[in-house]
Every structure is written in C-alpha cells, then in structure tokens.
UniProtKB/Swiss-Prot annotation:
Belongs to the 2-oxoacid dehydrogenase family. This is Dihydrolipoyllysine-residue acyltransferase component of branched-chain alpha-ketoacid dehydrogenase complex. The keyword Disulfide bond does not apply. GO terms for cellular component: cytoplasm; peptidoglycan-based cell wall; plasma membrane. Component of the branched-chain alpha-ketoacid dehydrogenase (BCKADH) complex, that catalyzes the overall conversion of branched-chain alpha-ketoacids to acyl-CoA and CO(2). The lineage of its organism: Bacteria, Bacillati, Actinomycetota, Actinomycetes, Mycobacteriales. Its cofactor is (R)-lipoate. The modification N6-lipoyllysine is found at residue 48. Keywords: Acyltransferase, Lipoyl, Transferase. It catalyses: N(6)-[(R)-dihydrolipoyl]-L-lysyl-[protein] + 2-methylpropanoyl-CoA = N(6)-[(R)-S(8)-2-methylpropanoyldihydrolipoyl]-L-lysyl-[protein] + CoA.
C-alpha cells in the first residue's frame, strides 16, 4: 500500500438526535502519535452531552481536523490516520492491519506512546482554555508524575490577569440553553401567576416513607401531584404551533415532564417520559436516576429532549421565589420556591408553617388567566392534602 493509499480520513461521526455540529473540548492525541483501534481521539461537546470519540483505525496521526474549542460540522474531517504497515510497529514486529471496527467498538486497547504534550486531564485542559492559560508554559504540574492540576491552572490564571475581560466562549449545553431562552423571550407572550402553599401534610407524608423509600422526596411528591393537576388541566400541557393552515394549539396526550438540573456543564433538563403512567414510587425512582445521570454526565440525548411541561426547582438552591423562563416551545413552566417556616394565619392566629411559593409562567396565546388560576388552585389543594391523591404509594 502506497503512502497516500494508506492514509484514512475519519469524519466527525453522526451522534444522533439531529445534532449537526460538535465542539472539540479536548484532544487526547497529537500529530505523530500512534493510536490503536477504539483508543480515544478526543472529547467533543454537543448541545446535549459530552462524549469521547474513539479511533476506528490503528495507525499514526497525520493531521487533526481542528483545534480545541473549534466547532466542526458532522461529516467534516476529524483526523487523518496513516494505517500503513510501517506506521505502527506491532509487538511481533509485523505491520499493523488497517481494520475499521465501527464507532464505539468494545475492543480492549493499550495506551500508545504520547508526544511531549503537557500532562493534564480533559477537564483541566478545558479550564485552561477558558482562562487563557498556556499549559505548555507550565511545563510540569504539581500532581503525581507532573500532571497539571486544576489548582495549577487557577494559580497561573491569577498570576497572569491583565486589564482585559475574561473572554469565555459559549458552546455546547450553554449555547443551546441560551438559544432556547432567547427564542422563548422573542416568540412567547408570557404572564405569570403565583400561589403560596402550606406543605405541612406533604412533609408529614414524606416522613412516613423516608426510611423505606428515600427517593420519595418532597420534590418527587410535588411532581406526582403536578402530573395529576396537568391531567385535569390539559391546556397547560400543550404547544402553540404556527402551521400552514393557521395558528393551532397541540394538546399533548402524554405528560413528558422536564425539570431543571444544575450541573458542572451547565443547566440540563432531563425528561420523565409518560409521567402520567408512573405511580409515585416509579416517578420518584426515575427522577433520582435522571438527577444522578445529569450530575455524572451519563444521560443520553434521548433523555434530554421531548418535554411537554417543565419544572424549575430553584427552591433547591435556597431561593424563595422566582420567575422562570418557558422552555420553548412549551405552553407553561412551573417554578418551585424553597420550603421554609413562614407566618400564616390559622383560625385567626398567626402561626409558623412550612410553606412554598409556586409560580406558573404561561403562554398567554394558549392559556388564559382563569385556566391558570384553576390549575394553580387545584395543585395547591393537592399539595396541602396529598394523602388521598397519592393512594398509589
């Protein structure tokens, strides 16, 4: 095989879910490195998740298709690899066989030799890029074996701060969130309604099950009651559509419940599909799984799309009240404030009770004030007397 014939081009793979571009967050190889089949070439960030892309060939890296931070289209050249018999020496002295095993193969590999690139984990390289720290200038880090650590990068950034701004590129999850929020603000005429809810019975119910079913949290119980209220007030679980036949409201048969989850990568919205078909334990377990997956970065794109109604639980961050932005193109979003003891009037006396503020922001083209009032009052009543509604526990 001639030199040119042995060079294989590997394009950015189609990662599914309609994604059209990726951002290269970290290269694990450099030009001149030897790679083996299924060895990680780089990490890329999409609008949904961060994934590692493995090599389908064994050989030597000839060219990289972009630098860290570059945005590459699906199908664009990611790397060029020389798979010729002289490119990589095998343990038995024979030439390597250029074998394409397909994206995501499970073949075990050994790490190939590296060039003299600074030693740092992908997340540290990403931080260094955001802070404009040259890893090569650090030479050797304080970690084991000279690995450059997060502390090394932060120390270098503090020492080299100039008069200019800290420029941080927006891509991946952050870019997708910004796009949806901007679209929501531009296209949806919103209004809001709030109610204060006494949560004493909700917390008592949670306490009864905390030992046997710790996943049944006040948040999970509230979501289950929300699903009940949405099934009785279906207009909140809908979407405004400008079709060729004129404006339409699409009322969704299934409640696909999204909820905001703050992660190191930004705000994610995991989705509980067909929440109306789950009992309280099933819903609570699924919510716990999705929260864990969001924090660990293991959610699939399918678990982050398709919501018909979204909940913003800013109360989990200690915030009493707020006005969330509708997750376009949904018709409404519900904000949950923190549950705290607050003064309320009971039987003519002021007493302390655990309360929570619920705020519904809604698309006023789809829903009118009376419909939202009915929905919010029903949800308040369910939360204040939850036991009968949750007989499926």
């Amino acid at each position: 095989m001639s030199g040119e014939d042995s060079i294989r081009s590997f394009p950015v793979p189609d990662l599914g879910e309609g994604l059209q571009e990726v951002t290269v967050t970290c290269w694990s190889v450099a030009v001149g490195d030897d790679v083996e089949i299924n060895q990680t070439l780089c990490s890329v960030e999409t609008a949904k998740a961060e994934v590692e892309i493995p090599s389908p060939y064994a050989g030597r890296i000839v060219e990289l298709g972009g630098a860290e931070g570059d945005v590459l289209k699906v199908g664009a050249e990611l790397v060029r690899i020389d798979t010729g018999p002289t490119a990589v020496a095998q343990p038995n002295g024979e030439g390597a066989v250029p074998t394409l095993v397909g994206y995501g193969a499970d073949t075990a590999i050994e790490t190939s030799r590296r060039t003299s690139r600074p030693l740092a984990a992908p997340v540290v390289r990403k931080l260094a890029k955001e802070l404009a720290v040259d890893l090569a200038a650090l030479q050797r880090g304080s970690g084991a074996g000279g690995v450059i650590t997060r502390a090394d990068v932060l120390a270098a950034a503090r020492g080299g701060v100039g008069a200019g701004p800290d420029v941080r590129p927006v891509h991946g999850v952050h870019a997708r969130m910004a796009e949806k929020m901007t679209l929501s603000h531009k296209e949806i005429p919103t209004a809001k309604a709030s109610v204060e809810v006494i949560c004493a019975e909700l917390l008592r119910l949670r306490d009864r099950f905390v030992s046997a079913a710790p996943e049944i949290t006040p948040f999970a119980l509230t979501l289950r009651l929300l699903v009940i209220a949405l099934k009785h007030n279906v207009i909140l679980n809908s979407t405004w559509v400008d079709s060729g036949e004129g404006p339409q409201v699409h009322v969704h048969r299934g409640v696909h419940l999204g909820f905001g989850a703050a992660t190191e990568r930004g705000l994610l919205v995991p989705v509980v599909t067909d929440a109306q078909d789950k009992n309280t334990r099933e819903l609570a377990s699924r919510v716990a799984e999705l929260i864990t997956g969001a924090r660990e970065g293991t959610l699939t794109p399918a678990e982050l799309r398709g919501s018909t109604f979204t909940v913003s639980n800013f109360g989990a961050l200690g915030v009493d009240d707020g006005v969330p932005v509708i997750n376009h193109p949904e018709a409404a979003i519900l904000g949950l404030g923190a549950i705290k003891p607050r003064p309320v009037v009971v039987g003519g006396e002021v007493v302390a009770r655990p309360t929570m503020t619920l705020t519904c922001v809604f698309d006023h083209r789809v829903v009118d004030g009376a419909q939202v009032a009915q929905f919010m009052c029903e949800l308040r009543d369910l939360i204040e007397s939850p036991e009968t509604a949750l007989l499926d526990l």
